[in-house]
Amino acid sequence: RYQRTFGKLRASVRANLNYSKFNQFIQNRQSVNENFSQTYRAQLRTNFKTAPNVDLSYRYTIQDNNLGANSTKFFTKSPSVEVDALIFKTFTFRTDYSYNDFSNEQSSINTYEFWNASLSYRKDDDSKFEYEIRATNLLDTRSQNQSSSSNISVSETESFIQPRYLTFRVRYEL
């Protein structure tokens, strides 16, 4: 990971690499399975006390699997943005958005987006009460995909997402 700060702006890049090789026998036949996953991320964010803070990032993942006669390769491209803003010293607005494109070597399998937002109110720093309304899954995304691998299998999983909903929260500090 490499990180650099320029005044109130912080930039970072990071890479995660994982290589696994499994040598096994299945019904007296040798099977050599290799998995190589790579995740690269670039991020740019601000760090202000009173101005809105923004976090922009881009994540690119490659999941390369070779199970003897079968091989698969999955890609995930995911730009995202987060905003955190203090408004009139009493309201805090937070929102986050991410776009995900999950594909294999031939085509895109699924694209999905997530967008969440919240608005909270606290009269002042000494106030015991805080009120918040939160909206989750504003774009009403229905499912997301992930790929995983082990020593004997590669799987591509589709998970179903809870529909859009709103919550209201009251918080009291003792």
Predicted regions and their residues:
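Exposed, low-structure sequence patches enriched in small/polar residues
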Residues: R1-L174
